Design a protein with these regions (language model features):
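A glycine-rich helix N-cap at a beta->alpha junction
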Residues: 1-8, 31
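Short glycine-enriched loop/turn motifs at secondary-structure junctions
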Residues: 2-3, 130, 182-183
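Short beta-strand to alpha-helix junction loop
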Residues: 9-13
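Residue patterns forming the tRNA-binding/recognition surfaces of aminoacyl-tRNA synthetases
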Residues: 17-20, 26-28, 198, 205-207
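Active-site cores that bind ATP or allylic diphosphates and position pyrophosphate for catalysis
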Residues: 22-25, 30-176, 185
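Catalytic adenosine-cofactor/nucleotide-binding cores of aminoacyl-tRNA synthetases and other
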Residues: 143, 155-271
Length: 271
């Protein structure tokens, strides 16, 4: 449900296509008929030559389908690429990190050969149509932000505020993933008997400074009242389950007899 449905991208293909067509008509995007084999060979040739150049070489830019079909490496099923200008602005203001400068993007694919949009196109269209004014996501998306700002600008839309959160790390500093760490799955915490408030408090501690020494247990209301984007730590916080165990114990001991009994029965029923 909800006022902005449908929410599955596969059910919104007719929503995305008009915006892709507009970008093509305005000269901000173009069809690319290069085959996967041709693109793979391009990457291999550059690697062999130790070329610093990366990204697509714009072979199809300015060509019609008929013109491109006469050249090697052609496919009947094109993708659509955004045409990134040479003078693209690479800097943007981040709510957490201040002014950030990202690498220069290449001509990103925004519509795949099967008619599905890539993340870059879909997220911009969806966020705009759903009224999102603040985008909060992981720091791995910093490099994509100039592309997204371009798409917002080309489509005549208000650019949202961006906040790029630090990624949670395992104890060995590697990125947390579902394959390596069961704790990457939200329902795992419920299955293990962690209380929601304990988990919320734990996540606060990972990226936000505590009130003071010995004041690690904090209500959500207190946290919201003192929240400031600029205070979020940018270093990759380590996911320490021992700290979560301790916090869970604090919250369990603060439960009244009836609440504790209810929680125990809920946990047993799920076993």
């Amino acid at each position: 449900g909800g006022p902005h449905g449908p929410y599955k991208q596969s059910e919104r293909l007719d929503t995305y296509r008009p915006y892709v067509d507009k970008l093509i008509e305005d000269g901000h995007a173009y069809y690319c008929w290069c085959s996967q084999e041709r693109l793979a060979q391009l990457r291999a040739d550059r690697a062999a030559a130790k070329s610093p150049q990366t990204g697509y070489d714009r072979m199809c830019l300015g060509m019609t389908k008929e013109e491109r079909a006469k050249l090697p490496g052609f496919t009947e099923n094109p993708v659509v690429r955004m045409r990134v200008p040479d003078d693209v602005e690479l800097g943007f203001d981040d709510l957490i990190r201040g002014h950030v400068r990202a690498p220069r993007p290449d001509d990103q694919v925004i519509l795949k050969a099967d008619g599905f949009p890539t993340y870059h196109m879909a997220v911009v269209v969806d966020d705009h149509l759903m009224g999102i004014d603040t985008v909060v996501r992981g720091e791995e998306w910093i490099s994509s932000t100039p592309k997204h700002i371009l798409l917002y600008t080309w489509l005549g839309w208000q650019v949202p505020r961006f906040a790029h959160m630090p990624l949670l790390r395992n104890s060995d500093k590697s990125k947390i993933s579902k394959r390596k760490n069961p704790a990457a799955r939200l329902m795992w915490f419920r299955e293990q008997g962690y209380l929601p408030d304990a988990l919320r408090n734990f996540l606060q501690l990972l990226a936000y400074p505590i009130l003071g020494k010995g004041q690690e247990v904090e209500s959500f209301e207190s946290f919201v009242a003192r929240f400031d984007w600029a205070d979020i730590a940018t270093g990759g916080p380590v996911f320490d389950l021992k700290k979560l165990d301790w916090l869970n114990g604090q919250y369990i001991r603060n439960l009244g007899p009836e609440a504790l009994t209810s929680r125990v029965f809920e946990y047993v029923d799920r076993m």
